[in-house]
Amino acid sequence: MLETLRGNKLHSGTSKGANKKLNELLESSDNLPSASSELGSIQVSINELRRRVFQLRSKNKASKDYTKAHYLLANSGLSFEDVDAFIKDLQTNQFLEPNPPKIIESEELEFYIRTKKEENILMSIEQLLNGATKDFDNFINHNLNLDWAQHKNEVMKNFGILIQDKKTVDHKKSISSLDPKLPSWGNKGNNILNSNESRLNVNENNILREKFENYARIVFQFNNSRQANGNFDIANEFISILSSANGTRNAQLLESWKILESMKSKDINIVEVGKQYLEQQFLQYTDNLYKKNMNEGLATNVNKIKSFIDTKLKKADKSWKISNLTVINGVPIWALIFYLLRAGLIKEALQVLVENKANIKKVEQSFLTYFKAYASSKDHGLPVEYSTKLHTEYNQHIKSSLDGDPYRLAVYKLIGRCDLSRKNIPAVTLSIEDWLWMHLMLIKEKDAENDPVYERYSLEDFQNIIISYGPSRFSNYYLQTLLLSGLYGLAIDYTYTFSEMDAVHLAIGLASLKLFKIDSSTRLTKKPKRDIRFANILANYTKSFRYSDPRVAVEYLVLITLNEGPTDVELCHEALRELVLETKEFTVLLGKIGRDGARIPGVIEERQPLLHVRDEKEFLHTITEQAARRADEDGRIYDSILLYQLAEEYDIVITLVNSLLSDTLSASDLDQPLVGPDDNSETNPVLLARRMASIYFDNAGISRQIHVKNKEICMLLLNISSIRELYFNKQWQETLSQMELLDLLPFSDELSARKKAQDFSNLDDNIVKNIPNLLIITLSCISNMIHILNESKYQSSTKGQQIDSLKNVARQCMIYAGMIQYRMPRETYSTLINIDVSL
């Protein structure tokens, strides 16, 4: 009734007040809770509704005594008379369906049972179809490994389309936020290649691709040199490439490689290497400056330093920028000594002191003795006696001098390692390089136990200062600072912020010098060590090109063994195994088998000398067998066959070939040729099986490794393929003759048919698959031969005998087929019956 009222609430009534009240009543009824408001909807068929309506109609009619309803309506302000008048005026006839014809209860029950049965059948069929669909999808996902999203990403990456990885970190954030204790590259789990730390795409543009190829060429040459035990200057190669590049970043990288170049062929001592590099760099700078401002006199190192002092410490009016310099004969003597030390020219500095001894102040006369001891010492240290005297003079006269020469203060500080609480002299250190050199000069790694704390200053103290300052204090010299101070791990970390490709190759350069171990050995055991993980750096880098350039990926992964530790070697082997399984580039990576059966090595085998493998054969066998199993599980039969060949598992190879050939023979159309004009042994199962049989079975060494049963099955299947070719060429008589020689079907009598039927269960599955086709071929040949004989105009006594003999063979085959019909496809037996009837 409410629905009827709702449909007609806009119609006119006897009064506007009644309409308004009824509309409000309808709207409020929608908000009333009911006993079934939280129950789900029930979907029933039309027939079920009819049945239930019929049951309801058969019950006693409800009483129509609604005398108390008007009290409820009156309390709500609704006049019962108005409602009654409105309801009477409703034209309900047009909304009511005619009464359905009366249905007899017995007929309704029978109708319900029948329809219910049909619904159950349809529901069962639908459930079976849904189950089959789910099973098929599960089979596809499990056996074919069709991860479409992954394949889509791989294809996009191969074509150079950059994909934003949700798991990658933002390498472009400020380097000042780097935590020096925590950087870690790659996943620490077992999966080396898929740590998802790399955002680099070497195929993003032509410039990046060209840079990638140039760097890869250097790595290839480096590996060739390693394999030949030759000497390859990898740093010089990168210097030659970066020398022609422009930009601030490239300038940093160029000088970084020059720092690495200075480390080769040396016993790596971070402090000494840093000092020597900075001294050579400064001397080269003064030489270039001297050539631009040629003065009178010989181009000696002393004259070059004097020229530098004139350029840097004099104003335009030739007056000194620092007023309190000690100038002797027009030369600031202490500045000259300082910059000679800055250039590593200790002998020249001593010579200058000796020549100017008479002009030095009385309080400074003893310094010449100290300096001689300093110059003659191997580690440039002073004896305890001299050190004590120098410290006394420094504290009493030099340090407290308000108008003293700052270069004299610097020289005293450097020679005696004085006042280490104030290591820097701003008036003297004109550049970051000067600041670095000053600190390196003051470092003393082997502090005596009785040395006071304020006189101790180690490399680690210096490294902590650099880390605390961060890149903002060093402008565009931060990378060089990290390398010169031995913070190689943080240097790689910092390079990642602006160029992942250069960071990786800088890591390669450091690894070639065995510098990773030095970096970790200079850390206190109390502090967490930086986890660089050279293996993961290289593995992450190969992410964007391991599919497009698997050969190049191998060249980088074999670099993991540069550190030569047992863990590094193991990681290298694991990374190569993952590369083979992931890229599936088996021919490129593992090799292939030539047409003559000879093994053609892949790139991994070519690089075996760099892999530090104990048993080369076992290593390749392990990788190949794992890849073969993966290919077999994924249903990639051709890859699996190739890999098992490389693993020299010849019996498994023949097993797979038998399965492939059997499937081809049983599933292919009998009216189509098995071998096409463009087929070859790499794509056609029949040609593949023939080549394998000719290579393996004729080789006594290989043949002994293959089970006799496998060889017999292979030969049987090859004979079936030959029969198929005869059948396709319509050579009916020859086909039957070869079929009889095959001895799989009964050709004599009923006893033979029964025996063959009993032996059917003992046949190999690869043969069982082909029995239905063999029966069809046999009966088709018999049918065609009988037809030819019947059409022949030649009449002889043997003609009838031939037909009877052929029909007898057909009869035995039908008896045999009848005994095994439930183990064959239904359509096969129907086809055989049709052929037999036509005979």
Curated annotation (Swiss-Prot):
It is found in: Nucleus, Nuclear pore complex; Nucleus membrane. Its main location: nucleus. GO terms for cellular component: nuclear envelope; nuclear membrane; nuclear pore; nuclear pore linkers; nuclear pore nuclear basket. It comes from the Eukaryota. GO terms for biological process: nuclear pore organization; nucleocytoplasmic transport; poly(A)+ mRNA export from nucleus; protein import into nucleus; ribosomal large subunit export from nucleus. One of its GO terms (molecular function) is structural constituent of nuclear pore. It is a peripheral membrane protein. InterPro entries: Nucleoporin_int_Nup93/Nic96. Keywords: Membrane, mRNA transport, Nuclear pore complex, Nucleus, Protein transport, Translocation, Transport. Residues 25-60 are annotated as: Leucine zipper-like heptad repeat, required for interaction with NSP1. Component of the nuclear pore complex (NPC). NPC constitutes the exclusive means of nucleocytoplasmic transport. NPCs allow the passive diffusion of ions and small molecules and the active, nuclear transport receptor-mediated bidirectional transport of macromolecules such as proteins, RNAs, ribonucleoparticles (RNPs), and ribosomal subunits across the nuclear envelope. Due to its 8-fold rotational symmetry, all subunits are present with 8 copies or multiples thereof. Present with 15500 molecules/cell in log phase SD medium. Functions as a component of the nuclear pore complex (NPC). NPC components, collectively referred to as nucleoporins (NUPs), can play the role of both NPC structural components and of docking or interaction partners for transiently associated nuclear transport factors. NIC96, which is localized to the core of the NPC and the distal ring of the nuclear basket, is required for de novo assembly of NPCs. It is involved in nuclear GSP1 import. This is Nucleoporin NIC96. The gene is NIC96.
